[in-house]
Amino acid sequence: MRAYLLSRLGQTLLVVFLSLTAVFFLVRLGGDPVLLFLPMDIQAKDLNEFRERLGFNDPLAVQYGRFIGRALHGDFGESLRYKSDALQLVLERLPATLELALAALLLTFCVAVPVGVLSAVRRGSLFDLLGMGGAVLGQAVPGFWLGLMMIYLFSVRLGWLPTGGMGGALHFVMPCVVLASFYAARMARLTRSSVLDTLNEEFVLTARAKGLAERIVIGKHTLKNSAIPIVTLAGLDTGQLLGGAVITETIFAWPGLGRLTVQALLNRDFPVVLAAVFVFSVTYTLINFAVDLLYGWLDPRTRARA
């Protein structure tokens, strides 16, 4: 088990390192960020002094080496726009993104798992047809379009919900629905498929032959043994919810990390972009690590192999 944990830790560090390296070079393809923060009529001498102070006159290899050295100490530099520590700025926005992502994940589970299980148990029924039809539709509709339509209908026309921002419970409704729609649809289809496969297993047939109540057969025997694919997808979805929050936060003016990252990219605020990628990478890999540990509880054979 110790070797397994060390292996996963090494993989986590490698993923974070490669992510930061890729983004470090990619963000520089967008051009010189200094020109966005200085007057158009600035003298060439002043421009050069400003670039020298920020270290942008150094060769790219030197900039990269300096960046890696500082990143090891959690120092991503100062935001070019906000003039404050980049990592601290990112961490201040992270709670809002986590709140939205966790609320969307809870909505995903509350909708997808019951729909998937009932569709499998009542295979071929009207409920199955409507549930899976809705799931296909949920995967097909783009999130940004759904968000705009919901704002138009529920905020502009009906006035039931706020158009954006972060405040009370009503501010969560539309962003959560938009963020969860695709993932709930995908999880519902996977849950149905996984439960259908398990229902044909011998231990389920044996449980039914013993006369156990259907709720016990489904809840205790079927659902737990169907859970590994669902947990795998849930782990992936949790990480992707953080990425999907970028679009959702932009549409609904949610003051989270996703919106900050988009603004930083548009402004070529390299320190903030790199700090955001670092936080996203660490969060995503930790989620996958937690999912791996959960496998051991669901399937003891996984622990034995580890």
Sequence positions of predicted segments:
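Pore- or pathway-lining transmembrane helices of multi-pass membrane proteins that form conduits
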Residues: 128-150, 174-178
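An internal, D/E-rich "acidic patch" concept
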Residues: 57-113
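Hydrophobic alpha-helical transmembrane segments of membrane transport/permease proteins
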Residues: 15-65, 155-174
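Membrane-embedded alpha-helical segments of multi-pass transporters/permeases
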Residues: 16, 20, 24-28, 144, ...
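Transmembrane helix irregularities
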Residues: 29-30, 138-141, 242
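Alpha-helical transmembrane segments of integral membrane proteins
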Residues: 2-4, 88-129, 166-306
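N-terminal signal-anchor/signal peptide hydrophobic helix marking the start
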Residues: 6-15
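Residue-level signal for discrete positions within transmembrane alpha-helices
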Residues: 12, 93, 97, 133-136, ...
